[in-house]
Amino acid sequence: MNSAPPPPYIPAAPSLFMDYAGRRYSINVPRFIIGREKGQCHLVILDPNVSRQHAAVELLQGAFFIVDLGSRNGVGYSGHRIRRKQIVEGDQFEINGHTIGFSFRNP
């Protein structure tokens, strides 16, 4: 008979999916980098007006956030430049005219 207590329940991290240029990406790292620098970014946008490391999607305490990494041209949301915003279902962000959408559902 085993008297050891069961291991603690650790809930799975929420799933986040990103849509860009007709492709769907699964965000499965705590910090997903978006930018133009190959080899340093998870999503590479080949545009000279996109910073080398432009923005990050970060998982913090069970919630996802998009964070501007000090880029020159910023991250847009609903016509405004943002530094950081919690991502909610259906959010769309602009990075120098490139639209990036987010969903917690994978159709």
Question: Which residue stretches match the model-derived regions?
Answer:
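Intrinsically disordered, low-complexity acidic Ser/Thr-rich regulatory segments
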Residues: 1-48, 58, 98, 107
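Short acidic, gly/pro-rich beta-turn/loop elements at beta-sheet edges
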Residues: 28, 44, 67, 76, ...
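Short hydrophobic/aromatic patches on the structural cores and recognition surfaces of FHA
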Residues: 34, 53-57, 62-67, 71-75, ...
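C-terminal boundary/linker segments immediately following FHA domains
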Residues: 70, 76-107
